[in-house]
């Protein structure tokens, strides 16, 4: 709850309902749009930018977060693989796995007690870390979370 979402490797209960394991997909080229352009974390960023990175089909608690980033990727079963299948040795499989459609929100902020929380899903590969927009995003997020903005 503190982070604002969860990734599961096995089916289980989440916030009072049964959910399947989460999904993943490596090396997805997608466009990210800034959902909150006036937020300090968005300072200096274009309205949209492209990344190629891993994406996750997981639980996002949209009622408890302030969206910051959205992807144009479709967060549906056909575009992801089952995390449970992966950890049991079947890496690129979604057989008999029928999760609900997921959230396209890739980054968000929230407050927990006196702490600022920021979650950024991108950051799985060197290409992402080498992207100037991602580096600006990450620097802004660190400053914001540390109350330096």
What are these regions (language model features)?
Residues 1-83, 87:
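An acidic, glycine-rich "communication" segment
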Residues 74-149:
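Extracellular ligand-binding/catalytic regions of CAZymes and related secreted enzymes
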């Amino acid at each position: 709850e503190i982070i604002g979402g969860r990734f599961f490797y096995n089916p289980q209960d989440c916030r009072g309902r049964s959910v399947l394991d989460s999904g993943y997909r490596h090396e997805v080229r997608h466009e990210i749009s800034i959902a909150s352009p006036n937020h300090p974390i968005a300072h200096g960023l274009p309205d949209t930018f492209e990344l190629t990175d891993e994406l996750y089909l997981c639980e996002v608690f949209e009622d408890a977060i302030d969206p910051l980033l959205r992807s144009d990727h479709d967060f549906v079963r056909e575009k992801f693989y089952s995390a449970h299948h992966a950890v049991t040795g079947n890496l690129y499989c979604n057989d008999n796995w029928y999760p609900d459609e997921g959230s396209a929100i890739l980054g968000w902020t929230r407050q927990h007690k006196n702490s600022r929380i920021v979650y950024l899903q991108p950051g799985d590969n060197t290409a992402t870390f080498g992207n100037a927009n991602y580096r600006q995003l990450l620097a802004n997020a660190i400053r914001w979370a540390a109350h330096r903005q």
